[in-house]
């Protein structure tokens, strides 16, 4: 059986870049890594409805620069940027370092795999027929400009006694081609029957 590899990690240095960009000596490396995880966790918890596909972190000396990619920049910025300033201060308390925040707008959320996975999870949580949900989401992504999409949902679909896997594929999704711009996202849907895992692969070109 073929071994599974994370599509983003597999392409770092080819079509993808590191989500954390900094250098550290042996003594500080683990501390910085844990700090990055705390920052990401905090952002996703506080802004869970802001449609954030990814958070990138850069460090230069003591300064920590956080790039937040979002489909809803208005939710993050607030009136006259007050929300961003409040949030930056919270992150400075969390890290004990000066923090600079940059909000980057995502213009086509239908082509961001993690946002598509979250949309599917939300629909499955409302007990919508999974086949209909997958087809609708796939059609929207293809219409937005995606070359191909693959969706996999697993768990007790439609409240079935035994868990099973539902798949939907449209267009080309070359997982083994390194130069292919492939985006990957995962989300968990919570239903009365239990948790359902949603995985999405989107081929952008």
Tell me the role of every PLM-derived stretch.
Residues 1-205:
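RNA-contacting regions in translation and RNA-metabolism proteins
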């Amino acid at each position: 059986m073929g071994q599974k590899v994370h599509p983003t990690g597999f392409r770092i240095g080819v079509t993808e870049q590191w989500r954390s960009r900094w250098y550290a000596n042996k003594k500080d490396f683990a501390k910085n890594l844990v700090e990055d995880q705390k920052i990401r966790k905090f952002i996703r918890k506080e802004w869970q409805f802001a449609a954030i596909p990814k958070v990138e972190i850069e460090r230069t000396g003591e300064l920590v620069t956080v790039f937040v990619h979002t489909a809803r920049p208005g939710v993050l910025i607030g009136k006259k940027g007050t929300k961003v300033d409040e949030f930056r201060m919270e992150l400075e308390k969390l890290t004990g370092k000066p923090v600079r925040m940059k909000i980057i707008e995502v213009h086509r959320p239908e082509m961001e795999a993690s946002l598509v996975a979250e949309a599917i999870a939300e629909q499955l949580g409302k007990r919508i027929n999974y086949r209909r949900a997958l087809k609708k989401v796939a059609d929207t992504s293809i219409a937005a400009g995606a070359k191909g999409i693959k969706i996999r949902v697993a768990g007790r679909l439609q409240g079935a006694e035994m868990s099973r896997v539902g798949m939907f594929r449209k267009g080309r999704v070359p997982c083994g081609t390194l130069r292919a711009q492939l985006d990957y996202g995962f989300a968990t849907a919570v239903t009365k029957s239990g948790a359902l895992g949603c995985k999405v692969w989107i081929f952008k070109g």
